[in-house]
Design a protein with these regions (language model features):
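Bacterial c-di-GMP phosphodiesterase EAL domain
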Residues: 103-104, 110-227, 237-240, 253-254, ...
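A short pre-motif secondary-structure segment
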Residues: 4-5, 10-14, 55
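Cyclic nucleotide signaling catalytic output domains
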Residues: 12, 23, 38-42, 49, ...
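Heptad-repeat coiled-coil signal-transmission/dimerization helices
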Residues: 2, 36, 77, 218, ...
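Short beta-strand edge/capping elements of PAS-family sensory modules
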Residues: 74-75, 93, 143-146, 179, ...
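EAL-family c-di-GMP phosphodiesterase catalytic domain
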Residues: 23-26, 53, 67, 137, ...
Length: 359
């Protein structure tokens, strides 16, 4: 809908998730501001009905000018991003032109610093993989393991930076697509070097869902290293899959044709959950740790986890529970019919592949 107010010489593009950008070449400031107002109004007029209720959509829009606010394209996007957050602070359905005296400014400049560090890490081989096992509840035998990415911290020699610090920035800037491909390539090489090792699961970002060449890259990499496709498991989050349902269905379909297994990660945190299971034909669902951490103490979570296990069993899917940290939770998951478990009770992430139980 917002794209309908854009003229032919203007570029309307999706940045990812629910974020879009419009590039206006050779316009005056007042023209950009008029367009911003039109976009905000157009979004507000979109009819949207969910579960029998009429909902009102809102948009926050930020405006930045070149060269007034930035020296290059990356900085221009960053300044427009700051202005968008300034608009959010002002209320719903509004827009703002970038101003330098904002707390959001400092936040975004920090994001730019992280983006530079991510670029440096990709260019200088400063990413590392750790592995954590995923085990059968019965007998605690390893079924497969998950690859977890870390970044070398050059400011603190010997230390690694956890993904929570850099992945959100990488998702925002799009560099996460390169990280995803690095992880896939490195995992396939590890699998090739250890023919008897267990399958490895890799996480795919929401950004990579829209990459139409990703499945071919996976197929080519597996073929190049002569690794059977069923040794690679691809995980994508429920929230990302539902937000980009068409792309998720396409990716799951092509991965299944290749022979890779697919896992729907962080299940239960999205707004759809059960309703979309039939549309997203993943082999496995991984229940979000939010529902598992205090499972033995939370009766509501127990009902939810049991229901997931029952529905998954009926659909022929495997269920994984993450963040399993005590015996009481493990026994409860066993009673609920959960197939596989992951967590510190069984092992901790390690550079060793395959990881060792209790390691």
């Amino acid at each position: 809908e917002a794209g309908t107010v854009v003229r032919r010489n203007e570029i309307f593009a999706r940045l990812g998730g629910d974020e879009f950008a419009i590039l206006l070449p050779g316009v005056q400031a007042n023209e950009a501001e008029i367009l911003a107002e039109r976009v905000v109004r157009a979004v507000a007029q979109i009819p949207f009905r969910f579960e029998g209720r009429n909902l009102r959509l809102t948009a926050s829009l930020g405006v930045a000018y070149l060269p007034d606010h930035a020296a290059d394209a990356d900085e221009l996007v960053a300044k427009a991003d700051i202005a968008m957050y300034q608009a959010k602070e002002a209320g719903k359905s509004t827009w703002r032109v970038y101003r330098a005296d904002s707390e959001a400014n400092a936040m975004t400049m920090e994001r730019l610093t992280w983006n530079n560090r991510i670029s440096h890490a990709l260019e200088n081989d400063l990413l590392r993989l750790h592995f954590q096992g995923i085990y059968h509840v019965a007998g605690r035998r390893m079924a497969h393991c998950e690859a977890l990415v870390r970044m070398v911290d050059e400011r603190n020699p010997g230390q690694l930076i956890m993904p929570a610090h850099f992945i959100p920035v990488a998702e925002k800037t799009g560099r996460v697509v390169e990280i995803d491909r690095w992880v896939i390539g490195e995992v396939v090489r590890r699998l090739a070097r250890s023919a008897e090792g267990p399958a490895i699961a890799v996480n795919i970002s929401a950004r990579s869902l829209g990459d139409a060449t990703l499945s071919q890259y996976i197929a080519d990499t597996l073929k190049q290293h002569r690794v059977p496709p069923d040794r690679l498991i691809v995980e994508l989050t429920e929230t990302a899959a539902v937000a980009d349902l068409h792309d998720a269905q396409r990716l799951i379909g092509t991965l299944s044709q290749i022979g890779c297994r697919v896992c729907l990660d962080d299940f239960g945190t999205g707004f759809s959950s059960f309703a979309y299971l039939k549309h997203l034909r993943a082999d496995t669902i991984k229940i979000d740790g939010l529902f598992i951490r205090d499972l033995h103490l939370d009766a509501d979570n127990q009902v939810f986890v049991r229901a997931i296990a029952n529905v998954a069993k009926g659909l022929g899917k495997t269920v994984v529970a993450e963040y399993v940290e005590n015996e009481k939770t493990l026994k409860m998951l066993d009673a609920f019919g959960v197939n596989l478990v992951q967590g510190y009770l069984l092992d901790v992430p390690s550079v060793v592949y395959p990881p060792c139980a209790g390691g």
